């Protein structure tokens, strides 16, 4: 090899050495950056700790979700219960007042039965009119009279005072009404007191 060729070769080799050195430095820097950004290996302690934290966070999130669902359900139940109580208060709010007025109605009925039409017809007429006004006023508040004479005995609406044989009457029917009953809407506030026929 000639001297010129040796010089050229040496020059070429030195230039490439410098290039390789720069390339290697760049590669090392890139490798360092990549290794810093890589996730830890599956068995690495920090990876296991992160997995445990994630599992705990998921469990806590699920517990909180269940609590919120239960709280919403409870809130809905409270809302419905309050609506029902308000509706019942509107519907049955006058029950105590009606119960207090029922003895007055009973007294008017007894007075009508005892009053002799022949002795004082105007008094009898006045009692009838008062009784009608009273019953009309009760109807405005959805109060209904229970007068079960001749009907089959119903323990939901009638109170049997006694039972006795009654020829010609079907068994288990009301043959005498001692005291009429009353209902407020669909609720019995006083059952009718009756005598029931036997077989």
From Swiss-Prot:
Tell me the protein's name: Protein GrpE
Q: PANTHER family annotated for this entry?
A: GRPE PROTEIN, GRPE PROTEIN HOMOLOG, MITOCHONDRIAL
Q: Which InterPro entries match?
A: GrpE (IPR000740), GrpE_coiled_coil (IPR013805), GrpE_head (IPR009012)
Species annotation: Legionella pneumophila (strain Lens)
Has UniProt tagged this entry with the keyword ATP-binding? no
Relate the assembly described in the record. Homodimer.
SUPFAM superfamilies (alphabetical): Coiled-coil domain of nucleotide exchange factor GrpE, Head domain of nucleotide exchange factor GrpE
Where does the UniProt entry say this protein principally localizes? cytoplasm
């Amino acid at each position: 090899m000639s001297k010129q060729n040796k010089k050229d070769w040496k020059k070429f080799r030195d230039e490439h050495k410098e290039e390789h050195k720069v390339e290697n430095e760049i590669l090392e820097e890139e490798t360092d950056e990549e290794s810093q950004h890589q996730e830890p290996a599956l068995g690495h302690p920090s990876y296991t700790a992160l997995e445990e934290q994630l599992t705990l966070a998921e469990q806590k999130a699920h517990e909180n979700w269940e609590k919120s669902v239960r709280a919403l359900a409870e809130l809905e139940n409270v809302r419905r219960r309050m609506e029902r109580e308000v509706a019942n208060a509107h519907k049955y709010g006058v029950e105590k007042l009606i119960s207090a007025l029922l003895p007055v109605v009973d007294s008017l009925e007894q007075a009508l039965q005892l009053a002799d039409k022949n002795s004082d017809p105007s008094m009898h007429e006045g009692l009838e009119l008062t009784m009608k006004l009273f019953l009309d006023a009760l109807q405005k508040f959805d109060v209904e009279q229970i007068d079960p004479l001749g009907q089959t005995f119903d323990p939901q609406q009638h109170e049997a005072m006694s039972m006795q044989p009654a020829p010609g009457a079907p068994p288990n029917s009301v043959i005498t009404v001692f005291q009429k009953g009353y209902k407020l809407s669909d609720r019995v506030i006083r059952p009718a007191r009756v005598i029931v026929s036997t077989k």
